[in-house]
Structure formats: C-alpha cells, structure tokens
C-alpha cells in the first residue's frame, strides 16, 4: 500500500470523525416544519441530541438542555448512545492508524504495520455504520410523522442540518476505512521458498575416467 493512499484514507476518516462530532453537538436534528397555518411564525424550534433551542424572529436564541432522557423520542435516545460510541471508535481507530502508519516507527515489521492499518480501517467502517444508523432512523421517523395525518401540524418537524452532516460523516468514514482496508502485507512474505538441491561433492581424487575413488581402494 502506497503512503499516499494511506494518508488519503486516514485524512478522509479523520474528516468524517470531525463531522460526526459536529453532528452530535449541533442542536438541529429536527426543525420546525413551516406548513399550514404555521408558515407565519414568530419562532423556530430546533431539537438536538442534548438540547432544544428556540429562535425568535428578532434573532434571539434560547437553548435548554433536556431535563430527562426519558423525555426524548426513542430514535434520539438511541442516537445519543450510538453517536458517542461512533466517536470513541473513530478516536481508537485514529490511534491504531498512527501506530501502523508507514511514516511512524512504532512498529518496524511491514507485515505487522499492514495488519494494524487494516484493523484501523475496520474500526472506521464500524464508526461509519454507527453514525449512519441513528441518522437514517431519525430521518425516517421525521418523514413518517410528517406524512401522518394523525400528527398535529404544530408537532411536525423537518430534517435539520445535523442529519446531512451525519450522512456526510458516514460517507467519509466509509471511504476512508475502505482505503485503509486495502492495505496488504508485502508480497515478498508470500513468495514460495525455493529449495535448491545440489549433488554431493566427493573429496577423493578424480581419475582420467572422471570417477572418484577413495584412497583405501588402493591398499
């Protein structure tokens, strides 16, 4: 695996990890849907994993941390845990990638470095999946409630910017992890060992006929 491909994979994975952090912190998983009579409103509501915010028409914004975890919808409760685990996995994957990087001397053996890099790629792939699942789950819930006639219009929401950031984070980590998983051990380690057999050499004198005799034959 070339160093350029390794750097590209690690850079994409790190960028995806940063986007995951933004997705986790941004309180815009759900935003007010401007439909029906609510098209003219004096405030906009944002809902995130950790807090909700109300933006007034004057530009003033007030945010409040959720008082209870049980007050959150089921998809946001699961998203909290999965997104945090995804961030921690990506951190661990980054540390493993640095250990197995070709530009570091933590490990001297090239074969071991390649295997460590593959492990880092798998960790980033898992982090991408753990980011993709809650983001897609939340988007599905928002769309389902939006078209549900039993849900009041005042309670309907639209997808916020955090969901799009989460999808981008998942895509970047998937691509970066896939590039790191392309790291293979050097082919020299798989080359078959060739065994060369040579005829035994005689220590006795060689006659004119080319046959070697031991000296005891002349006694």
UniProtKB/Swiss-Prot annotation:
Extracellular compartment residues: 30-80, 137-159
PROSITE patterns found in the cross-reference section: CLAUDIN
Record field: transmembrane: 9-29, 81-101, 116-136, 160-180
GO biological process, one term: negative regulation of gene expression
UniProt-listed Pfam families: PMP22_Claudin
Domain of life (superkingdom): Eukaryota
Membrane topology: Multi-pass membrane protein
UniProt-annotated location(s): Cell junction, Tight junction; Cell membrane
Keyword Cell membrane appears in the UniProt entry: yes
Main location: other
Record region (Interactions with TJP1, TJP2 and TJP3): 218-219
Positions of post-translational Phosphotyrosine modification: 197
Disulfide pattern: none
Topological region Cytoplasmic: 1-8, 102-115, 181-219
GO cellular component, one term: protein-containing complex
Keyword Iron-sulfur belongs to the record: no
Keyword annotations: Cell junction, Cell membrane, Membrane, Phosphoprotein, Tight junction, Transmembrane, Transmembrane helix
UniProt modified residues of type Phosphoserine: 198, 208
GO MF annotation terms: cell-cell adhesion mediator activity; identical protein binding; structural molecule activity
Family to which this protein belongs: Belongs to the claudin family.
Assembly behavior: Can form homo- and heteropolymers with other CLDN. Homopolymers interact with CLDN1 and CLDN2 homopolymers. Interacts in cis (within the same plasma membrane) with CLDN19. Directly interacts with TJP1/ZO-1, TJP2/ZO-2 and TJP3/ZO-3.
Purpose: Plays a major role in tight junction-specific obliteration of the intercellular space, through calcium-independent cell-adhesion activity.
Name of the protein: Claudin-3
Gene that encodes it: CLDN3
């Amino acid at each position: 695996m070339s160093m350029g491909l390794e750097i590209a994979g690690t850079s994409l994975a790190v960028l995806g990890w940063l986007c995951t952090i933004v997705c986790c912190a941004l309180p815009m998983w759900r935003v007010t849907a401007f439909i029906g009579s609510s098209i003219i409103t004096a405030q906009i509501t944002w809902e995130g994993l950790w807090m909700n915010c109300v933006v007034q028409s004057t530009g003033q914004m007030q945010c409040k941390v959720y008082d209870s975890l049980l007050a959150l919808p089921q998809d946001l409760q699961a998203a909290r845990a999965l997104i945090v685990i995804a961030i921690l996995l990506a951190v661990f994957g980054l540390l493993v990638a640095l250990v197995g990087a070709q530009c570091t001397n933590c490990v001297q053996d090239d074969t071991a470095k390649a295997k460590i890099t593959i492990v880092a790629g798998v960790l980033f792939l898992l982090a991408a999946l753990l980011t993709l699942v809650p983001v897609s789950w939340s988007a599905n819930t928002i769309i389902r409630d939006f078209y549900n006639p039993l849900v009041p219009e005042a309670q309907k929401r639209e997808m916020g910017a955090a969901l799009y950031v989460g999808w981008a984070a998942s895509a970047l980590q998937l691509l970066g992890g896939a590039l790191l998983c392309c790291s293979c051990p050097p082919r020299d380690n798989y080359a078959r060992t060739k065994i060369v057999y040579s005829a035994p050499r005689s220590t006795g004198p060689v006659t004119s006929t080319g046959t070697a005799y031991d000296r005891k034959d002349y006694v």
